[in-house]
């Protein structure tokens, strides 16, 4: 009967009520599922995707964003995404609320979600206890007679139903102020455009066994913080705060590492950061799951993932026409860097045999989008676009962005060099300053100052530094291929024969 009741409740949840909530079109999401690589470099999915996200706006101009990273199944992340929306978007927040009110509502919402999930598995836990009482005591499961096989199968199904947990990072925008609530290891970054470049700030702290504040909290409960830090994980996870995971919530006294705790050591209480004023800010907000920055750290080493991801987003803003495309391009790029590092067999390959699900949410605050998004820019009136292929060296790093330039031929009367008419040339000619920037990074704790420049080689600095040897004819192999340019020029001007590059 309990199983039938749960099945009915689950069927009633399809489709989700959140399907009718208005989406925020000032944000975009990209994602990739987990991968494990075999010796030949082929990747396969280790488990069904466990990440989730949300990006909604309410009628009272409140915006809600979230990225959720699950483990041991996706039930918890799905539950949290739906229930948290209900606890924050049904009138609980409004423009009359003070900063203290918003923080209180966020804390209350996480508490309700945690309690509601644990209550939702009560029936399964009761059924599990009932079935376990029917098994003979002291007999290992693999030695049980065949008549207990159905009970064992049902116990396995129940374990899958009640297992798992989730980490969450949530952002609320209300009254031009940003609030971030975090449980676990997902991250929130605020990237601001300044006169000195792109300022990258991590708004939350990772709740891990490396976090000294978390280790102190656990030590106050009577636990050995040094041993926890040495172990690095608690019941298979680095996080010290999580939603769900009934095993560590209900059974921590049976876990050697946690048994001495005076109260529940693994909690779902979020840390609230903010309010962060957004008036006059130009930039973007980043919410990302642990899998994204961990994959990049595996390939490039720890310490610079935030800055690298922010720089990738900055580059894609100039190339893409939608925020979804921006986020997906960055996720795809990190995924490619990770797989290429494994395939290279180099020093970092041993750190890249697999990666978890990756999710990236980007919320725009007036940052220029799509300045170089068109593969063939619109020419000035009377002009024509002639492509010029500029191949980068095959030896370049996969973390750099290759660029295809387009040469816009102006109409007569416009000057190519020096001054030009103010009619349309500025709009027609793409700006290249955002492509393949040189980043100057200065990091202190969670704050990073990132400056972009192209003065030390510009777009072509990835060209090999050594001189290319001349060929048999005494000429160096051309760097820029004008063949397509000459062909189109000849067609437009009625030439009988197609010119070729010298």
Swiss-Prot record:
Interacts with XIAP and BIRC7. Interacts with TRAF6 and MAP3K7; during IL-1 signaling. Identified in the TRIKA2 complex composed of MAP3K7, TAB1 and TAB2. Interacts with TRAF6 and MAPK14; these interactions allow MAPK14 autophosphorylation. Interacts with STING1; interaction takes place following cGAMP activation and promotes TAB1 recruitment to the endoplasmic reticulum, triggering MAP3K7/TAK1 activation and STING1 phosphorylation. Disruption phenotype: Mutant mice die in the late stages of gestation, exhibiting edema and severe embryonic hemorrhage. Glycans are attached at residue 393. Residues 28-365 form the PPM-type phosphatase domain. Its main location: cytoplasm. GO terms for cellular component: cytosol; endoplasmic reticulum; endoplasmic reticulum membrane; protein-containing complex. This is TGF-beta-activated kinase 1 and MAP3K7-binding protein 1. The modification Phosphothreonine is found at residues 429, 440. Key adapter protein that plays an essential role in JNK and NF-kappa-B activation and proinflammatory cytokines production in response to stimulation with TLRs and cytokines. Mechanistically, associates with the catalytic domain of MAP3K7/TAK1 to trigger MAP3K7/TAK1 autophosphorylation leading to its full activation. Similarly, associates with MAPK14 and triggers its autophosphorylation and subsequent activation. In turn, MAPK14 phosphorylates TAB1 and inhibits MAP3K7/TAK1 activation in a feedback control mechanism. Keywords: Cytoplasm, Endoplasmic reticulum, Glycoprotein, Membrane, Phosphoprotein, Ubl conjugation. It comes from the Eukaryota. Coiled coil: none annotated. Residues 1-21, 414-476 are annotated as: Disordered. Residues 7-17, 414-437 have a biased composition (Polar residues). The lineage of its organism: Eukaryota, Metazoa, Chordata, Craniata, Vertebrata. The record marks 482 as: Required for interaction with MAP3K7. One of its GO terms (biological process) is in utero embryonic development.
